[in-house]
Structures are given as structure tokens and as C-alpha cells.
């Protein structure tokens, strides 16, 4: 045995490394017994061991597993049994001790991943300290570990469209070299790809004035632009209307057809004879029924407060006339206009086809020229009764409804010397704010306000109390500071007005109406110098214009031309201009504020008459100045006064001044 061991000594398994420290504190690992190894050990050490010596494996000692012993007999070539897996030994697999195992050693900076089933870690996001003398951090078993060295590296881009590299993907460095830049930009689509072409056409807005592209210096409501590409017609959304709505619409259809026809009686009869009696009856009706345009609805102001009509106005029989009956009546009203933007519940599904057919004709008629004549069918949906109410532009506080608490900015462009001691006629005075302001501030000899709507005239007469109360309040403040009221002790005696709730005065108007002017009172002092009359200034025939006699020094025509133009067409507007010229005395002036043509289309669907006249208009507002100075009318000259800086751009309209010669030609 000794000889055999000596001969086979070079083939023995090398001795295991010295055992590591028992970090886990467990028992010994599995023991392996080998007779050949024991014999060779005796030759080296020279000591005698008993039969069956045991050799402890280094791996078992290091692991501390305390597993079962494995004995190998008759192993070929004297080799001992292979120890268990190194990973299993280090984890302490197969041992009976349940102590925490030692962490594995990192190899070349790589931490091997533990399978989720081994080791029995604690809950997530917790720090685990190994048992025994040496404490170490243990990563959670079921949490993915971040790799230090990734197995698969990310593929960096190598092909750049602009010819750059990873450090210069846009190839900006090529711009430093002019030759390279010129070569790259020789073919534009390659160096800078063109954007994808969209489905919708690009709308190019070309301004009318290239020096003012934003139309900041113009006074029109809308900038006149020309579209190089056609507009895209959007689809309108219509709410679903059930059968209940259709039944209700059919039930109310018969009543609306009869209620839409207005009476054909004259709006205002003549001022003498039977007309005076009829006018008194109308005044009584206005006192009884509440008026929607009244500023003070709780106080019934007597019409006798207003001074009587001047004799010059009573003497002229043809100064006031009624509008033609054809322009007052209109088509039956069944539903709202198709051009209205708001959703209305007064149109049923059966009208969808008619609405679509009329919309196309209206769009084509918007840009119709003056010299062309086309056939424009009427809207199939009809006109509403509410629209007939305001067909003459007789909105309450038409000019100042957007800024009711502010002063009329048109007063800033007017000059007081135009009105002092003059006879003034204000056409389309509405509720009379501008008329009363001029009569109160600048002292005209006579101020006549004329409007076609009797309800607006009724409100204008009631507004006299407000202006008179304001004047009385200012006079009271002035008298308080008068030095002539000093007493015996040298102190100023101030007579304070009785305290009264300001809210009642603001909501209910003045406490008392102004006094009725006595006989012989000065008629040139406010409020005796102002009077409001209901009537239509547009005459029926040209023969009546020739019979007009001069009566006034100043005629005001603010924001009126559009409504005369739409209701009576070119003939009615020309007739009104000629009558204004004949109504002025030699040396008189006309203050004109026309509306722009762009604002006409917004009101073309009010009535059937307006819709027809809109497409027949040939005399545009830009041609008013040339027409008024032509021999057909007779004004000698005109000038642009200014454009009031109104807060609303739609009311920023130019104000013109037309002069009548001292010796008129006719």
C-alpha cells in the first residue's frame, strides 16, 4: 500500500485551500473520507493514524452547513468524492442550521443574481444585516438588481440625414466651412426636408392697405380682406329635437303668420288738423302702457313738460310725413334667420333642407358689386317678429348701449360755435342723449330731435328730467360757494339739501318733474329749447322734396344712413340728402356720420324689404361725399372733422362736415 501510494502520488488531488472564517457561525460542512489521501498524509507527516481518518473539506468548513457525511470507498486513482456545488456550499444548502448565509463574493465587479426562491429575504425596501460577527447589507431577493455592466449595450445611431455625427447630429460644424455649406445646401430637400403638405388649403389674407396691414388707422367695423384661397364652409351642429317640439312648432305656425304683419297706419300724422288729435291719443296710450325703453318706469312724466312745438315747425305741412306702407309690412315670421349664429329652438327638422339652400345664396350675395344685377332668392325661413321691431335700427340707446355710463365721445369732436344760438335738427335722435347734451351745454336757440319710433321719443321726453335735475344740482353746488351769502359773523351759510336715499333717485329717477315753462319764458334756455318729434324724414316722392323750405342752420345725421339705405334703397337715401340740403339755410352745415359698408351685411336679413334692397344698393358709403358735393345735391365743400375714439371699434366712425354756400345755386 505504501509503494502504490508513493507511485501514484503525482496523481493525487491537490490539497484544498485553508478554510475561511466561519462568518455564519454554523457547524461544519460535509465530511469526505479517503483511504488513499489518508495514507499519503501519513507519508508526509510521519505520524500514524488509526483506520478511517477523516479529512474535512475546505469548502465545508467555510460554508458552515453541517451537512451529512459522504464516504468514498474504492475510488479509482485514489480520488476523493467531489465536493458539493460551490454555490450551494456558500449558500449553506442542505444544512440543518437555519442561520443567515454568508453573502457571495463579487467576481470582477459583477454581483451574481440570487434566485428568488433561496435565502428567505425580508420584506421589500428593508436593510438586512447578516448574523454572526460580520454584518453586511443584503439586497432584497425579489427586487431587480441594477446591473453594473449591461449584457447588451444600446446601439447608437450612425446614419444622420444632415451628415453629422453623434456629437454633432445637426451638422452645425459644417456651417463653419463655406464650401461644405454651399455643397450641402445645393439641394434643399436633402439638407432641410420640406414639411408634409396638409389637406386644408392655406388661407392667405391680403390686406386692403399694405401700409396698414392690421387696419389700425381705418374706422370700419371689419377689415376688408381678400382671401386668396376659398373659405372652408363648416358644418353646423343641430340639436336633436323630439316630436314634442315639432308638434309645438306646428301648433304655433298659424298664429305667427298673422301676427307678423304690422299695421300700415302712418307712424306719425301731421302736426295740425286731425293729426294733432291722433297724436294726443297716442300720448295717452303711451302713458298707460309700460314702455320698455323708459329709463324711469315707476314715474309717469307728463308730456306737457316739453315745450310746445315752434311755429316754424307747425307751419311746414310737408316737413313730416309717413313712410310708405310697403316698407312697413313684411313677410310672415315662422323661424329665425339662417344666418343667426345662436342656436334657436324655434326651427324644426323639416326646415333643414330649406335652411341649407338659402345659406348658399346668402354667401354668394355678400360680395356682390354695385354694377352687377343678380337674382337673389329670399330666405325660406322667413323673418322673426322681434326683428321687425328693430328694422329701422331703433334700438334703445343705439349708439351708447355698449358704454351706457360714459359720456358720448362724439361730443369731443363737435365744436360749440356750431350750435350756439342756432336752429339744430337731429335726425334719428333715439332716446335723446346727444340731443339733450348739446341743448344743455352749448345753448342752441332751438333743438329738435326726430325719430321714427314713438317709444324712443317717449323715453327721450322723460330723459329731460334727468338732465334738468343734474343742472339744478350743479346750480345748488355753485350757490353754496357764493361769497355773497355771508352772514353777520362772516361765516358762509350753507343750506344743505334734505338727505334722500341715493338708490331711489338712481333707480326711480328724479323726485319731481321739471316745471312747465310759463308763457313768455325764454325758449332758448334749457329745457325750453329742446323738443322731440316722431316722424319719418324720408319722403315718398321727389315732388315733396322740391317743396321743402329752409328752416335750420345745422342738421345732425349720426349713424342713420345705413338704416335709410336698407329700408328705402338708393332712392330713399338720395331723397333724404336732397331734403337735408333744402332744409338748411344758406351757410348751414351738415354733420354726417355714415356707417361703413361692411356693417350692412349684418342686418340684411331683418325684413324682406331690407333683403331685397341690400342687393340693389349701388351708392356705397365711400361715394357719399362725391354725391353730396355733386350738382344733384349742391353742397359746396366738405371736410373730415375727426374719428371719435370709441371704446367699441364698431362705433369708431368718421365725422364729416358739409357746407352749404351762402348763395345757393338752387
Curated annotation (Swiss-Prot):
It is an enzyme of class 2 (transferase). The keyword Transferase applies. It comes from the Eukaryota. The modification Omega-N-methylarginine is found at residue 91. The keyword Nuclease does not apply. Dephosphorylated at Ser-126 by the PNUTS-PP1 complex, promoting RNA polymerase II transcription pause-release. S-adenosyl-L-methionine binds at residues 399, 410, 428-430, 451-452, 536-537, 558. Its EC number is 2.1.1.-. There is a cross-link at residue 620 (Glycyl lysine isopeptide (Lys-Gly) (interchain with G-Cter in SUMO2)). Core component of the 7SK RNP complex, at least composed of 7SK RNA, LARP7, MEPCE, HEXIM1 (or HEXIM2) and P-TEFb (composed of CDK9 and CCNT1/cyclin-T1). Interacts with METTL16. Interacts with RBM7; upon genotoxic stress this interaction is enhanced, triggering the release of inactive P-TEFb complex from the core, yielding to P-TEFb complex activation. This is 7SK snRNA methylphosphate capping enzyme. It comes from Mus musculus (Mouse).
Amino acid at each position: 500500500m505504501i509503494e502504490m501510494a508513493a507511485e501514484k502520488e503525482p496523481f493525487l488531488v491537490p490539497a484544498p485551500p485553508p478554510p475561511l472564517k466561519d462568518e455564519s457561525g454554523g457547524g461544519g460542512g460535509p465530511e469526505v473520507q479517503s483511504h488513499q489521501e489518508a495514507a499519503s498524509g501519513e507519508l508526509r507527516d510521519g505520524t500514524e493514524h488509526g483506520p478511517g481518518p477523516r479529512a474535512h473539506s475546505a469548502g465545508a468548513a467555510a460554508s458552515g452547513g453541517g451537512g451529512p457525511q459522504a464516504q468514498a470507498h474504492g475510488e479509482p486513482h485514489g480520488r476523493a468524492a467531489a465536493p458539493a456545488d460551490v454555490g450551494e456550499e456558500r449558500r449553506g444548502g442542505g444544512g440543518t442550521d437555519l442561520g443567515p448565509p454568508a453573502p457571495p463574493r463579487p467576481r470582477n465587479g459583477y454581483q451574481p443574481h440570487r434566485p428568488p426562491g433561496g435565502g428567505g429575504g425580508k420584506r421589500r425596501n428593508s436593510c438586512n444585516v447578516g448574523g454572526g460577527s460580520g454584518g453586511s447589507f443584503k439586497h432584497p431577493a425579489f427586487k431587480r438588481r441594477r446591473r453594473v455592466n449591461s449584457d447588451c449595450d444600446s446601439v447608437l445611431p450612425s446614419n444622420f440625414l444632415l451628415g453629422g455625427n453623434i456629437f454633432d447630429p445637426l451638422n452645425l460644424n459644417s456651417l463653419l466651412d463655406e464650401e461644405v455649406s454651399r455643397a450641402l445646401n445645393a439641394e434643399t430637400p436633402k439638407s432641410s426636408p420640406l414639411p408634409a403638405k396638409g389637406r386644408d388649403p392655406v388661407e392667405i389674407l391680403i390686406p386692403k392697405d399694405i401700409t396698414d396691414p392690421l387696419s389700425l388707422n381705418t374706422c370700419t367695423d371689419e377689415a376688408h380682406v381678400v382671401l386668396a384661397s376659398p373659405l372652408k364652409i363648416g358644418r353646423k351642429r343641430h340639436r336633436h329635437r323630439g316630436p314634442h317640439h315639432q308638434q309645438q312648432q306646428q301648433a304655433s305656425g298659424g298664429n305667427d303668420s298673422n301676427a307678423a304683419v304690422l299695421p300700415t297706419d302712418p307712424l306719425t300724422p301731421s302736426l295740425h288738423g286731425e293729426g294733432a288729435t291722433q297724436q294726443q291719443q297716442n300720448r295717452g296710450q303711451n302713458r298707460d302702457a309700460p314702455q320698455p325703453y323708459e329709463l324711469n318706469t315707476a314715474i309717469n312724466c307728463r308730456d306737457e313738460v316739453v315745450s310746445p312745438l315752434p311755429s316754424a315747425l307747425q307751419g311746414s305741412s310737408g316737413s313730416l310725413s309717413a313712410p310708405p306702407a310697403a316698407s312697413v309690412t313684411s313677410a310672415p315670421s315662422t323661424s329665425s334667420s339662417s344666418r343667426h349664429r345662436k342656436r334657436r329652438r324655434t326651427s324644426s327638422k323639416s326646415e333643414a333642407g330649406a335652411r341649407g339652400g338659402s345659406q348658399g345664396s346668402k354667401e354668394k350675395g355678400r360680395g356682390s358689386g354695385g354694377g352687377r344685377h343678380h337674382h337673389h332668392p329670399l330666405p325660406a325661413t322667413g323673418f322673426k317678429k322681434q326683428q321687425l321691431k328693430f328694422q329701422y335700427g331703433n334700438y334703445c340707446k343705439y349708439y351708447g348701449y355698449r358704454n351706457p355710463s360714459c359720456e358720448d365721445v362724439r361730443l369731443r369732436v363737435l365744436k360749440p360755435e356750431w350750435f350756439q344760438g342756432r336752429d339744430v335738427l337731429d335726425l334719428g335722435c333715439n332716446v335723446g342723449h346727444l340731443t339733450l347734451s348739446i341743448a344743455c351745454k352749448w345753448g342752441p336757440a332751438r333743438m329738435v330731435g326726430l325719430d321714427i319710433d314713438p317709444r324712443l321719443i317717449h323715453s327721450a321726453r322723460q330723459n329731460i328730467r334727468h338732465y334738468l335735475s343734474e343742472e339744478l344740482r350743479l346750480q345748488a353746488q355753485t350757490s353754496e360757494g357764493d361769497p355773497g351769502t355771508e352772514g353777520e359773523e362772516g361765516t358762509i351759510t350753507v343750506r344743505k339739501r334734505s338727505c334722500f336715499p341715493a338708490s331711489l333717485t338712481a333707480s326711480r329717477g328724479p323726485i319731481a318733474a321739471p316745471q312747465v315753462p310759463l308763457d313768455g319764458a325764454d325758449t332758448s334756455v334749457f329745457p325750453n329749447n329742446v323738443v322731440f318729434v316722431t316722424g319719418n324724414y324720408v319722403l315718398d316722392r321727389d315732388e315733396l322734396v322740391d317743396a321743402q323750405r329752409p328752416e335750420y342752420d345745422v342738421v345732425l345725421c349720426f349713424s342713420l344712413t345705413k338704416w335709410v339705405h336698407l329700408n328705402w334703397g338708393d332712392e330713399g337715401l338720395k331723397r333724404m340728402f336732397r331734403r337735408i340740403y333744402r332744409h338748411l339755410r344758406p351757410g348751414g352745415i351738415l354733420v354726417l356720420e355714415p356707417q361703413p359698408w361692411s356693417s350692412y351685411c349684418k342686418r340684411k336679413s331683418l325684413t324682406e324689404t331690407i333683403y331685397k334692397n341690400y342687393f340693389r344698393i349701388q351708392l356705397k358709403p365711400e361715394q357719399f361725399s362725391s354725391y353730396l358735393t355733386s350738382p344733384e345735391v349742391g353742397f359746396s365743400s366738405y371736410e373730415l372733422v375727426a374719428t371719435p375714439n370709441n371704446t367699441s371699434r364698431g362705433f369708431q366712425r368718421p365725422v364729416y362736415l358739409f357746407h352749404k354756400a351762402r348763395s345757393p345755386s338752387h
